[in-house]
Amino acid sequence: MSLSSRATLVVLCCLFMLIPSFTTAATEQGLHARSRCESYSFNNGKSFRSCTDLLVLNSYLHFNYAQETGVLEIAYHHSNLESSSWISWAINPTSKGMVGAQALVAYRNSTSGVMRAYTSSINSYSPMLQESPLSLRVTQVSAEYSNGEMMIFATLVLPPNTTVVNHLWQDGPLKEGDRLGMHAMSGDNLKSMASLDLLSGQVTTTKSVNRNMLLVKQIHAIVNALSWGILMPIGVMAARYMKNYEVLDPTWFYIHVVCQTTGYFSGLIGGLGTAIYMARHTGMRTTLHTVIGLLLFALGFLQILSLKARPNKDHKYRKYWNWYHHTMGYIVIVLSIYNIYKGLSILQPGSIWKIAYTTIICCIAAFAVVMEILQFKKRWARLFFKKSKDVEADQPTVSVDVIGETEKAERKKASGGIEIQIENYNITKNFMIPSVFVISYPHTSPPLLAFHSYHHPSTSIAATAA
């Protein structure tokens, strides 16, 4: 037998030895998974013939079902739960969604600690889960809470010979005053629905619907973050900072228009389009995020309309139009950034999304701060330079020349100046004449002339000394 054949035989032997181990592990895992549901015993002594481990939210469903009569006795069991939480289990006899679901709701009173269980019929996508009768007959509704486990018990009567039902289960926080808070809008809370075979206990999920909706929500977040949260601020910065440089005129204007129009219409098509899709499939909830989103589209549309009413640069109303246009633009930017963070808190896609957007916004804000400082220095430098020029123009200028006797005579002759004598460098009399004022004083040999010219915006004076 060759060496390769021996090696192959050894490998096969090892595999055959490992197969029983894999089988045993799988069997133990299956028994363990099955025991999570079947081995549970209720404190009230109730027992159920069937049970199933629900896929998400640490939940289990125990039930007894009589097909001939349609009587369904259930116990919905939710583990690893805070006492300040509410739970719900529902059957939807008409569809797979939330609208039309007939729900059982339970929570623990924050003051007395007593459990409350009641029924609630869900007729919209923004339910308050208030107590209301169901379309199904239901009796013996009760609830229990112990050691982080909350349970709902009830008996429902389904149409006879019903074998498969669409059921939903959910949890959420309990607010002040025992108000039921909104459940999470991401992760497992969006996957808590399935079809239940009452005869076999098999659960069939609707993963495609959940995945499609999650994809739509991600597209909605990305499109709006890029359009309203990034392109819009860049367009505003182009108009504010680039137009101060003549070399960038009119490039800044085209960048501003492209960023604003692209941001608005991409947000209109991608953002509003996905929002309408989600409203049709999961319901339009009147939240602050929704209100701000609609307000942003309205303000953006007004900005577009205002371009038709823009006066010429030399028009007396142009400054008022600029105030309006700039103010509306800044309001849109602030609301956009706030609403993006609001949407991220609803979607809860993971911290990396918020970190990435925050990093981009911080970079844009840092660049804006630097440009504001540069513009401030440039503006004040220009203003200071202008004031210095004005002061310099108002002040007289003085110049002194040393000339010889010959040039002195020529200047005196040309100007018609008056020569007077000065003793001890003290001027005894001043003469203001239209052209030149000449003063002479004794000086040592060789004779020099100190020509002192005094210029003022309104007159010209010269003083000479010999």
UniProtKB/Swiss-Prot annotation:
Membrane topology: Multi-pass membrane protein
Pfam family, one: Cytochrom_B561
Membrane spanning stretches: 219-239, 252-272, 287-307, 327-347, 355-375
Keyword Metal-binding: yes
Cofactor binding, per record: Binds 2 heme b groups non-covalently.
Domain Cytochrome b561: 179-380
Keywords: Electron transport, Heme, Iron, Membrane, Metal-binding, Signal, Transmembrane, Transmembrane helix, Transport
Primary location group: membrane
A GO MF term: metal ion binding
UniProt signal peptide: 1-25
Subcellular location: Membrane
Keyword rRNA-binding: no
Cofactors named for this entry: heme b
Binding site for heme b 1: 220, 289
Function: May act as a catecholamine-responsive trans-membrane electron transporter.
Protein name per its UniProtKB record: Cytochrome b561 and DOMON domain-containing protein At3g59070
Organism of this sequence: Arabidopsis thaliana
